[in-house]
Design a protein with these regions (language model features):
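An N-terminal hydrophobic leader/cap segment in hydrolases
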Residues: 16-84
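Catalytic active-site module of serine/aspartate enzymes centered on a nucleophile-bearing elbow/loop
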Residues: 306-329
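Conserved alpha/beta-hydrolase
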Residues: 125-145
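Catalytic nucleophile-loop/oxyanion-hole region of alpha/beta-hydrolase
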Residues: 115, 141-174
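Short alpha-helix in the alpha/beta-hydrolase fold that links the catalytic acid
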Residues: 252, 261, 275-284
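Short beta-strand/loop motif that positions the catalytic acidic residue
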Residues: 258-259, 265-267, 271
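Hydrolase active-site cap/lid region
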Residues: 190-245, 294
Length: 329
């Protein structure tokens, strides 16, 4: 009996030790993922994992065009503006006026990106179509302050701060559109669930994800081949500690169920970073007037590059419908 008891105790000890190691491994893995997602500085251990995280398969032609357009926009004359956000963070924007403005676009870039990188290619189209553009530097990135990014959870409120600035600068008569790419698209779609001023005539969202939790699960499972499941609770707690809001607390789907602001959704059908199914979810949930453009063969953020004419025609048709004053429901 004593030998059997000793074996049982030993086996139990090994099992407990194995479970503890597995639990620690899960914690360390998910911490690296959440630190990468939210921290201003990319953790050194993840610096070489960019391609695995995004799953992108962009061509050299796209990369070269994007870099050239980014460099060109970055050096164009503009007015650098600063505001203090609702929570005290300093936010930076770049204001591009035009001679005969027909509308204002407030543009929000994506995760670990920049205003001139994400909007370099489309900037000429906006300018030639009489748009004043305010390119925002998202919190926790580049010249805006903030220790963390928020995957739209915190940035959605920054939309209101920038809208207040825009109304002071341009008045409330000119139509305003919120635009975003990737996390910037999620930012403006989550903002759709807030009480937006009536001069916001539309939202233009390119390849946005539905929620922080949903995109983290996709990246973990499909791109990094890490089981997420139970780890989502750990991720949620870590997120809440960093930015005071949980990763499951808000989503674009819920926001779009309660908005009256017209929306145009764009997505590449071959997106490996943010699956196109997320845009279909957003489109189905949206109760406001809505347009949809899916670009075959386009990976993440490549829709304008792949089909510029279709993209421009869809956007111009959207403006033609909604430049007029918006009626509140």
């Amino acid at each position: 009996m004593k030998k059997n008891t000793k074996k049982i105790v030993t086996a139990a000890g090994i099992a407990a030790g194995t479970a503890a190691v597995a639990s620690l491994s899960a914690y360390v893995t998910i911490k690296a993922l959440i630190d990468t997602a939210l921290d201003r500085e990319m953790p050194k251990v993840m610096e070489k994992a960019d391609k695995r995280i995004s799953g992108e398969k962009s061509s050299d032609e796209f990369t070269n065009r994007m870099e050239s357009a980014s460099e060109s926009l970055a050096v164009q004359p503009n007015e650098t503006v600063e505001i203090i956000a609702h929570d005290g963070e300093k936010l930076v924007g770049h204001y591009f006026p035009c001679e005969k403005p027909e509308r204002v676009i407030i543009a929000f870039h994506g995760w670990r990106s920049s205003w001139h990188r994400d909007f370099g290619m489309i900037s000429d189209f906006w300018y030639k179509n009489n748009c004043i553009v305010l390119y925002v530097e998202q919190r926790g990135q580049n010249n805006s302050s903030g220790e963390y990014m928020g995957f739209g959870l915190t940035e959605r409120f920054d939309c209101l701060d920038w809208l207040n600035w825009e109304i002071e600068r341009c008045g409330s008569d000119i139509p305003v559109y919120l635009a975003g790419v990737s996390m910037g698209a999620t930012t403006v779609l989550m903002a759709a669930g807030l009480q937006l001023p009536p001069n916001v005539h539309g939202i233009m969202a390119d390849c946005g994800f539905t929620s922080a939790n949903a995109i983290w699960e996709h990246i973990a499972k499909d791109n990094l081949h890490i089981r997420f499941g139970i780890r989502s609770a750990i991720a949620d707690r870590m997120c809440r500690r960093k930015i005071q809001v949980g990763s499951k607390e808000h989503s674009t789907v819920e926001a779009l169920k309660h908005t009256h602001v017209p929306v145009i959704l764009v997505h590449g059908a071959d997106d490996h970073f943010v699956p196109v199914e997320m845009t279909y979810e957003n489109y189905t949930a949206c109760t406001a007037p809505k347009d949809l453009l899916i670009v075959p063969g386009a990976d993440h953020g490549m829709s304008y590059f792949m089909e510029p004419e279709k993209y421009e025609n869809a956007v111009k048709a959207f403006w033609a419908k909604y430049d007029r004053p918006r009626c509140e429901a």
